[in-house]
Amino acid sequence: MSNCELKPARVFEQFAEINKIPRPSKHEERMIEYLQDFGKKHGFETETDETGNVIIRKPATKGHENAPTLILQSHMDMVCDKLVDVDIDFLKDSIQTYVDGEWLKAKGTTLGADDGIGCAIELAILDSDDIEHGPLECVFTRDEETSLTGAMGMKAGFMKGDMLVNLDSEDEGQIFISCAGGKTTSAKFTFEREEAPAGYFFLKASIKGLKGGHSGDDINKKRANAIKILSRFLYMEQDKMDLRLAQFNSGKLHNAIPRDGVIVFAVPANEKETVRVDWNIFTANVEEEFHVTDTAMEFGLESTDAEAVIAKECSTRFIRCMQAIDNGVFAMCQDEALAWMVETSNNVASVITSENEINIVASQRSNVMSNLENETNTIKAVFELAGAEVKMSDGYPAWKMNPDSKLTKVAVESYKKLFGKEPIVKGIHAGLECGLFSERYPNLDMVSFGPTLRDVHTPDERLHIPTVQMVWDHLLDIMKNL
């Protein structure tokens, strides 16, 4: 089955075109050009701001000229991740997709439905001449996944609409009306390398095949974090013997739970069998701990070539730090109606070793900004106690619920009419661009919804095909009835 045979055909045709365009975060130039050409080809007012956001304005259809101007918004970039054995250049190559039952998947890579499917819905509406709607502004932001660059750089007045539908949510049947704020904390350990003591034996330990996932939406699913697992083992062995660390590399993205990692270390030759036994026991325990969430994890331990190691004093501080830093959910929402929702969390996202530095990135999220500040300071303090140089991003704000939202009421009533059931109206423990929009456009009425996606930011990302039709029908009905 090809994408063009999927329903609604016009949406999947647009998605197929989008997936021909390389669009990693911070490298959206070709996508920006495509959107500009699309708008101009259709004769619509098309504008690009200095950040690279694109807006295409479509006039109202007959009889809807007096409706409020509705903004449809999605982000044009995608997270690029792949299986270890997949050969792809995300800056040049297309995403290859296939249908598996009711799911659309990619061949060993992220699918790019986050948020390519939102872009495809917007383009399909722009391309149509048979859909009723008021004045429309279709907005495509850049670099949402790494830095929210587009939303952060957008100036007040670029969007002129009264209401906004963000098409970057991942559970059909759920209408999101608030989101978490977030910050990123980075730490750097600087060191000199030295030769390992004579007679030391080098080992390489690895882990792969973890489930991973989105560091906001999936943080409460108790999935394994490759960095924390490898850190546990290093701390355990360092406590028993003179271990010398040479390399620690795991994770790529601040908003993804790390799925694999490799460490290289040296131990006295007479301890190498102890390490092997400990590793076997340790990995068996980890497999038991995560036997529900991470069923495909694989471990490796092998001898490797000698290399210069990190200075002992720095290595010790780093390993202790990585054992001490917490990961996962810190607090659930206190409101009884939202007790199921994560309030505050931290994701230890990446550790990268270079010749004379170890760089660590951790991302904090909270729906309560004071708790976000406290959590960020807690992570910062752990790094500082370990002697690391610490930097914190400016972060992005939470999007607060608007109890008087007209758009929410219209969206809920439309859903009930179309599908005969109540949608779930909720907040999300992830950053949405709506939080930044709410700062620059304080009177903007917003909701967020989208088709069902699973395992975004991983090569297991998949799109539930039937829900695309449901979201399409829902959005068109909202536009007709505003």
Name every feature range the model reports, one short phrase each.
Residues H64-T146, A151-D162, F202, S315-F318, ...:
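Active-site metal-coordination/substrate-binding segment of hydrolases
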Residues K7-V11, E343-I358, S363, F419-D477:
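Zn-dependent metallopeptidase/amidohydrolase metal-coordination segment
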Residues S2-E102:
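Acidic/His- and Gly-rich active-site-bordering loop/insert found
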Residues E102-K105, E145-T146, M152-R365:
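Midchain, well-structured core segments that form catalytic/ion-binding scaffolds
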Residues D218, N225-K228, R232-F248, M401-L444:
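Active-site-adjacent substrate-binding region
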Residues K222-K240, A269-K272, R317-D326, M332, ...:
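His/Asp/Glu-rich mid-to-C-terminal helical/loop segments that flank catalytic regions of hydrolases
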Residues M341-K426, A430:
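Substrate-recognition/cap regions that form aromatic- and gly/pro-loop-enriched pockets
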